[in-house]
Amino acid sequence: MVSESHHEALAAPPVTTVATVLPSNATEPASPGEGKEDAFSKLKEKFMNELHKIPLPPWALIAIAIVAVLLVLTCCFCICKKCLFKKKNKKKGKEKGGKNAINMKDVKDLGKTMKDQALKDDDAETGLTDGEEKEEPKEEEKLGKLQYSLDYDFQNNQLLVGIIQAAELPALDMGGTSDPYVKVFLLPDKKKKFETKVHRKTLNPVFNEQFTFKVPYSELGGKTLVMAVYDFDRFSKHDIIGEFKVPMNTVDFGHVTEEWRDLQSAEKEEQEKLGDICFSLRYVPTAGKLTVVILEAKNLKKMDVGGLSDPYVKIHLMQNGKRLKKKKTTIKKNTLNPYYNESFSFEVPFEQIQKVQVVVTVLDYDKIGKNDAIGKVFVGYNSTGAELRHWSDMLANPRRPIAQWHTLQVEEEVDAMLAVKK
């Protein structure tokens, strides 16, 4: 029995032993994660093998990798920022409707726009409507009025003109006042002009001055009396406030005429251009020496038949209406733009320098007849405008020559100013 059972046991197949020996992966399929890990491991191993072949130290390779990554990130950042900026600009353009776009025409029209706006603001402050705006210029034409008198002395053939007073003059100065004076002259010759004294800071000056014109009664009817009110300006051209004209053939000289007349806007008469002259002034106080250098002239009036002139310059040193010294330049033939560069010196003590006048006259030389004056100008005591500035600059800069251009004036007008302002 024992032998039989033992024999059966030896004859039976070893099932359990076979089952334990078989591996699990032989009976179950591999998972996807495990396949990817194997591929990555192989790629990593291959990359490291190639990396070890490069003849660079590991730290250098790491630095190169970092720089490459930074470059890529920078490019991405710039691209994103540019896209966002374009979107913002488009939105702003749509919202604002192109208000920020200013062209050259807008810039050029800026001044005009501001001026128009200022006028509108003025109208708003005064409460004017559009309909009233058209009538406003008529009210602005009120320039004040002037009282005068006229008489004729038949025994002495003299026209007597009295300038009595002015009233309601407009304010032309910054302080809300004016410095008025009156010019009186006869047309058409304008040879003799008179001026009243300047009354400072007033709109209602009282003059009470009389002027005399020597005119035969037979010639008086063809003349017109002009009375013009000016605002005196020490450092620039005097502004005309207004004027009026009185034809002499409309005046009854059988009695004295005295009346008020409203001032009207002055007619813009084109003054005959006589030319310009340039000269320098230099004063040395310690030596009492005044030096005048006549440099050049330009655009002189044509005096000769051929359309040219033979100009030369006279320089007079004057005080209290008296000629103290006289000098003159050489004659420049056939030219309207002469160049001189000639120097003249005068002895003027320091205590007298503010009391003298330098009168510069440009004349046309004539061999046969009288030398005709082209134009004239004076600097020094009682000068005004550009002439006063030139004189003041000379005194403010002793020992230094100060050159300046001056516009020539009619000889008779300058002589009248010199005679009145003694």
Curated annotation (Swiss-Prot):
Keywords: Calcium, Cytoplasm, Cytoplasmic vesicle, Differentiation, Disease variant, Glycoprotein, Lipoprotein, Membrane, Metal-binding, Palmitate, Phosphoprotein, Repeat, Synapse, Transmembrane, Transmembrane helix. CDD domains: C2A_Synaptotagmin-1-5-6-9-10, C2B_Synaptotagmin-1, Syt1_N. It is a single-pass membrane protein. It is found in: Cytoplasmic vesicle, Secretory vesicle membrane; Cytoplasmic vesicle, Secretory vesicle, Synaptic vesicle membrane; Cytoplasmic vesicle, Secretory vesicle, Chromaffin granule membrane; Cytoplasm. It comes from the Eukaryota. Residues 1-57 are vesicular. GO terms for biological process: calcium-dependent activation of synaptic vesicle fusion; cell differentiation; cellular response to calcium ion; chemical synaptic transmission; detection of calcium ion; fast, calcium ion-dependent exocytosis of neurotransmitter; membraneless organelle assembly; neurotransmitter secretion. Coiled coil: none annotated. Glycans are attached at residue 25. The modification Phosphoserine is found at residues 265, 343, 345. Ca(2+) 5 binds at residues 304, 364, 366, 372. Ca(2+) 3 binds at residues 233, 236-237, 239. Residues 122-134 have a biased composition (Acidic residues). Residues 142-261, 273-406 form the C2 domain. Glycosylated. A lipid is attached at residues 75-76, 78, 80, 83 (S-palmitoyl cysteine). Expressed in melanocytes. The modification Phosphothreonine is found at residue 129. The chain crosses the membrane at residues 58-80. PANTHER family: SYNAPTOTAGMIN, SYNAPTOTAGMIN-1. Homotetramer. Heterodimer; heterodimerizes with SYT2 in presence of calcium. Interacts with SCAMP5. Interacts with STON2. Forms a complex with SV2B, syntaxin 1 and SNAP25. Interacts with SV2A, SV2B and SV2C. Interacts with RIMS1. Interacts with PRRT2. Interacts with DNAJC5 in a phosphorylation-dependent manner. Interacts (via N-terminus) with RAB3A. Interacts with SYT12. Interacts with calmodulin. Interacts with DNM1 (via C-terminal proline-rich domain (PRD)); this interaction facilitates vesicle fission during clathrin-mediated endocytosis (CME). The first C2 domain mediates Ca(2+)-dependent phospholipid binding. The second C2 domain mediates interaction with SV2A and probably with STN2. Belongs to the synaptotagmin family. This is Synaptotagmin-1. It comes from Homo sapiens (Human). The lineage of its organism: Eukaryota, Metazoa, Chordata, Craniata, Vertebrata. The gene is SYT1.
